[in-house]
Amino acid sequence: MLDIQLLRKDIDAVAQRLATRGFQLDVALFQALEAERKQLQTQTEDLQARRNSLSKQIGMLKGKGEDASGPMAEVAGIGDTLKASAQRLAEIQDQISDAMLSIPNLPHESVPTGKDETENVEVRRVGTPRTFDFEIKDHVDVGARLGLDFETATKVTGSRFAFLRGGVARMHRALVQLMVDTHTLEHGYTEMYVPYIVNAASMRGTGQLPKFEDDLFKVPRKVGGEDGQDAIENFYLIPTAEVPLTNVVRDAIVAAEKLPLRFVAHTPCFRSEAGSYGKDTRGMIRQHQFDKVEMVQVVPSEQSMDALEQMTGHAETILKKLELPFRTVVLCTGDMGFGSTKTYDIEVWIPAQNTYREISSCSSMGDFQARRMQARMRAGQGKPELVHTLNGSGLAVGRTLVAILENYQNADGSVTVPKALQPYMGGITRLEPEA
C-alpha cells in the first residue's frame, strides 16, 4: 500500500508515475473522499471539543449547586450529531482504505518505462543454447517415456496437473534439495517449513487480496461466531511461499540489528490461472499446482536495491550450477507485478519453443507490503520504521525440470543428469526410458 501522504501532497505526480504502469488513478474520486474526510474530521473534533467543554462546565455548575440544565440539554443534542458525524467519518475512512488497497506500487526510478513485456530490457545472458543433431522433442514427449504422466492426473483431478513417476520424480526431488542446500549453505538463508493454507489477513498483507482473489483457491471453513452460530471464514491455498514467509513479520517490530532476515522454503503453490485460459495448455509450464523454492528477505530501506541484486544472483546460481542457458531481464513499468517497485525476471532456454521462458522472478516491494502488514524495525530506542521486503523464486521446480528434460535430452530418448544433480540422485548419470 502506498503512503497516503504522497497522494495528499502531490496526487498528480503519483498519478503520472502510476500511468507508466498502465494504472489510471481516479484522482477526482480520491480528492472528493479526502475533502469529505477533512470536513467530517474537523466537524467531529469540534463537536468532541464542545462536548468536553460543556461537560466541564456542567461539573462546575453542579459543584456550585447552580442550574446546569442548559449545558446538559446542549450536550444531549451534541451526542446524536457527534455519533452521526463519527460514523460517517469512519465510513469515508474505510472507503479511502479500500481504494488505497487497489492502487499498485510506484516503479523505482531505475525501472525502464514501457507498455508491456516487449519493452523489458535484457541485462545479461549466460550460456549458449545447445545445437542438436537430431529432432528436438518437447518435455511432454521426452517425459512421457520417463514417468511424466498428464493423462492420469487429468483422470484423478483435471487439466493442468501432473503425476511424476520414477526417475523424473526423483529428479524433481533432487532439484529441491540442490536449491535449498545452495540457498541455506551458500547464501545464508534460514530454511522454513510453512503452512500451505493462510488466512485473509496474510493474503492482504502481501497484496494478493483484494485484487487477485479470482486467481486463488479459496477454502471456506466454519468457525464459531460471537452469537454462538457458525460463521464462514475464508482461508486460501498459498499461491507462493512468499505469503507465509513475508507475513512472519506482520504486526511485528524487529530489532534493527537482527536485519536482514533471509528465509527460504520449498512448498507446493496453487493458482487458479483464471486469466490464463488457452495459454501453455500443453505440459508443465503452467499448472494449477506446482512446486517452488522461494526466497524472502526483510531489510532496512537503504539496503533494498542492493538486496534485490543479491537475490537475483542467488537465483541465477542455481541455473549456473545446472549449466542451463538463461537470460535476465529487468521488467518495464507496464509489465511489473502489482506490489513490485522493481523486478528482474530470469528466463531459461527452452529448446522446443526456441525461446527463453520465465523460471524466476525477483522483486523488491519497497515498503509496500510492510505498510499493509505494519512490519517495522527499530534501531535502539528510536522510532519504529517500515522495513522493506523482497521475494524471489529460487527456482520454480517444475519449470527447471522442463528445462533439463529438453536441454539434456538424447537421441535415444534418455536424459543426461546434470553433474550438479548427480550427488542428489545416487550417482545416476542418465534417466533411461521406461521399458
Swiss-Prot record:
Looking up CDD domains in the UniProt record yields: SerRS_core (cd00770)
Say which domain of life the source belongs to. Bacteria
Which keywords does this chain's UniProt record carry? Aminoacyl-tRNA synthetase, ATP-binding, Cytoplasm, Ligase, Nucleotide-binding, Protein biosynthesis
| Catalysed reaction equations from the record | tRNA(Ser) + L-serine + ATP = L-seryl-tRNA(Ser) + AMP + diphosphate + H(+); tRNA(Sec) + L-serine + ATP = L-seryl-tRNA(Sec) + AMP + diphosphate + H(+)
Q: Where in the cell is it found?
A: Cytoplasm
Q: Per the record's keyword annotation, is Ligase included, yes or no?
A: yes
**Which coarse location class applies to the principal site listed for this UniProt protein?**
cytoplasm
Does the entry feature the keyword Cell inner membrane, yes or no? Answer: no
**Record-annotated residues binding L-serine?**
T240, A241, E242, E294, S393
Look up the EC number in the record and give it. 6.1.1.11
Kindly list the positions annotated as binding ATP. R271, S272, E273, E358, I359, S360, S361
Pfam families attached to this UniProt entry? Seryl_tRNA_N, tRNA-synt_2b
> What family does the database annotate?
Belongs to the class-II aminoacyl-tRNA synthetase family. Type-1 seryl-tRNA synthetase subfamily.
Its biological function?
A: Catalyzes the attachment of serine to tRNA(Ser). Is also able to aminoacylate tRNA(Sec) with serine, to form the misacylated tRNA L-seryl-tRNA(Sec), which will be further converted into selenocysteinyl-tRNA(Sec).
Its subunit composition reads: Homodimer. The tRNA molecule binds across the dimer.
Q: Which NCBIfam families match?
A: serS
Name listed for the protein in its UniProt record: Serine--tRNA ligase
**Organism for this UniProt entry:** Cupriavidus metallidurans (strain ATCC 43123 / DSM 2839 / NBRC 102507 / CH34)
